[in-house]
Amino acid sequence: ILAGYGYDMIGVDNSGDMLELAMEKRLASGHDILYLLQDMREFELYGTVRAVVSVCDSVNYITEPEELAEVFRLVNNYLDPGGLFLFDFNTEYKYREVMGDCTIAEDRGDCSFIWDNCYYEEEKINEYDLTLFIREGSDDNGALYRKYRETHFQRGYTLEEIRELLSSAGLVFQAAYDMDTGEAAWEKSERICVIARECGKRPPEESGPAQEAGESRQAQGAREV
């Protein structure tokens, strides 16, 4: 999506299967996107970038706060001076009060799933077993459903914890929005989008007013996207 807006993109994922799917979409889109097979806790780039974007509650998969602080430190390291970091996360409130211990099942025609959820409040760990039934073939050729099973572990974080971890990594918190309402995040937000900024690096001394104005416009575009 962002490549379609004209941004030069680098994609990082720890799953070869996910990257393979991404590369298939890249081929279909015609965009020039670099993909890297890396663990976010140890990711390396070839230089700094103007923005880092993390979506689909990826940070919740980092279940140790110390490791998440290291992820944020790496983000800060690879951001340009004043660069933006945008990410979303599921809150502890959502896991504790909304999800809890439950089973969710849904039939979507070509695929169905069973989601068995369990939240361990003391450890702040949400575990869910996901069983998928994916349709293959057509009715004319004898369609069948192939079964897949996955187990996921995610940690519930509060916004206060996220802000403290950002600060410990040298990033400056800018804003947090409830992803259901678009309004400012509050204590009962289930999913939050956070905007943070790098502030520790100095821009090149030769940067003139025109260049700085251009960077300001590009940063504004990143916020709007």
Regions found by a protein language model. Give the residues of each.
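Class I SAM-dependent methyltransferase SAM/SAH-binding core
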Residues: 1-42
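Conserved beta-strand segments of alpha/beta enzyme cores
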Residues: 8, 32-34, 112, 172-175
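A short acidic, Gly/Pro-enriched loop at the edge of an enzyme's catalytic core
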Residues: 41-51
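A short SAM/SAH-binding and catalytic strip from SAM-dependent methyltransferases
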Residues: 49-67
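SAM-dependent methyltransferase
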Residues: 86-165, 225
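C-terminal lobe and adjacent flexible extensions of AdoMet/dcAdoMet transferase-like proteins
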Residues: 153-212, 221-225
